[in-house]
Amino acid sequence: MSNEILIKNIYYMLSYAFQVLNQNGYKNIETERFNNTADMFAAIIQKGIENQLKRYLNREYVIETDSLSTLRGKIEINESINQMSFLKKKLICSYDEFSIDSYMNRILKSTLLLLLKADISKSRKQGLKSLLVYFSSVHEIDVHHINWKLQYNQNNQTYQMLMGICKLIIQGLLQTQSNGKSKLMDFLDEQRMCRLYEKFVLEYYKKHYPELHANAAMVDWDAEGETQYLPSMQTDITLCDEKQKKILIIDTKYYNSSMQLQFERASYHSGNMYQILSYVKNKESKTKCKVSGILLYAKTNEDITPNQHLSILGNHFEVRTLDLNVDFSTLKSQLDLIIHNNFIAA
């Protein structure tokens, strides 16, 4: 399958992670063709900012310092003396200004400037440049030191998706120094794809199988004595059918290699097996439900890929792959088959 299909599927995965992408304002993106993931993200952020401009750019109070002939706000005495502004019959004052030069708008502008250095189409770059006009009074921000712990309220909640996409873009395109030259990193590395893959599978099951109450549930240890130093156990996806008293724990994995080699012998990643086994056995001890587990790897190009059913210590386990490089309808069928095999046909 072509790289174009994988890029398109990444967009669909994002549409589950960011539900706003399913709104009409973004529908035309689905029909576009992209050269790479950077081009796709540029299209999303362009459309997102265009939609935001139809409302308004977020404003907030920022502190401005200026030399003024009339008093405003707080007088900066030391600065006024140092600059001898009184000789010009002026004072250095600091005051609050309701401005579009907000922290989030700085992130948006810096993201646009970063994308202009990326490998995206000329028409896309022209579209991004046209948006910069609206940010002429907005300062840039150091993209290496952004505080992503942003606060949202009724006035800026439409920025939540924009900031999420900006974070993916900036972390994917951060410039690194190598021999004095700046270069762009791979846009979506293994770590970022791992988080997107996990979020996609969880949100897919939340949307299409609400009766299974999909969530990233915590698992308590079946232990006696002091347990405060035991690591927490949080599943990627837990599905629960209360009527059938069945629980399925899914641990998603996105690796460049879904198998490990030990002494020239291929095997499943031992840490992953221990992890899913621990989740299932500890969960089973705290419930009357039948508990099963799946290690769900994103499919790679390896000769040997996981695809096996196992019974371990009386519990059913699967180690299987999800092929992301197929038409999205086929991708959905793979996810639906997991539900069918574990809750419907079982």
Which residues are covered by each model-predicted region?
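Catalytic core segments in nucleotide and nucleic-acid processing enzymes
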Residues: 190-346
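Generic alpha-helical propensity signal that fires on short helical segments
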Residues: 59, 63, 129, 184, ...
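Terminal, charged accessory segments of proteins
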Residues: 1-182
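Short amphipathic alpha-helical segments at helix-loop
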Residues: 147, 185-186, 264
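A short, highly charged nucleic-acid-interacting micro-segment common to nuclease
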Residues: 152-156, 182-201
